[in-house]
């Protein structure tokens, strides 16, 4: 026996692509840590040869991640989409595409911070290359099964997102992430469910609580004391527990549930932590991410403070 095997019906291939500066290198490093075989900047002409190359029998089930972007030799998005279709139609391959997106202003900031030049604008402003690349990549973005917007992600946030999406889930359960965020700092682009916690009274306007977060006991107690808190949060928990088995039956591999308040530091943080604890008590294993927890409190983001009349009614 040769000790080699051709890729079988369970072979898994993930094409990792997207805008320059959006995080492809970070994604490939995490996938490698998760046990994937990783190849970056592969010329498009070699893609099929790589997929069909014999592998050792013990590694036949190892998933393969291939990084391809505008720097790759022979890169043409429309042609790549066509080749993916052909490879799928050939059977025996689970081929998916992950596209990393990011807002132009944030990409400009990243290129400026690292002092790197955009690959499509070596002698021009980065904004020119970003705009050109975005237009070029649009066919791939529309085609991709997985689109992750990294605009508001730190490196750690992106690493966690990749682990949630492409780590091994147990017993067919979807990978579950609970996220808190601030509406004033942008909606999360990848959430399946979004709950607005701004109806609860806001600890930001209490000088003693403003510097704290929803993880602090005194802030949590303030939020819990809202007359609407227990009834509404309990209803949200019941809804989520009803939906999760249905998501599993539908075959969803990951579910992100987001809780937002104005700044993302108080109400949403507390409620997200409570819901995550409730889900753990029901046998789930969610990860918990607080997107804006480390952001500085800003009065300008929180709107107008409650009126004196409202404060006298207990909504401080």
Curated annotation (Swiss-Prot):
Residues 283-316 are annotated as: Disordered. ATP binds at residues 18-25. Keywords: ATP-binding, GTP-binding, Nucleotide-binding. Pfam families: PapZ_C, RapZ-like_N. This is Nucleotide-binding protein Sala_2050. GTP binds at residues 69-72. InterPro entries: P-loop_NTPase (IPR027417), RapZ-like (IPR005337), RapZ-like_N (IPR053930), RapZ_C (IPR053931). Belongs to the RapZ-like family. It comes from Sphingopyxis alaskensis (strain DSM 13593 / LMG 18877 / RB2256).
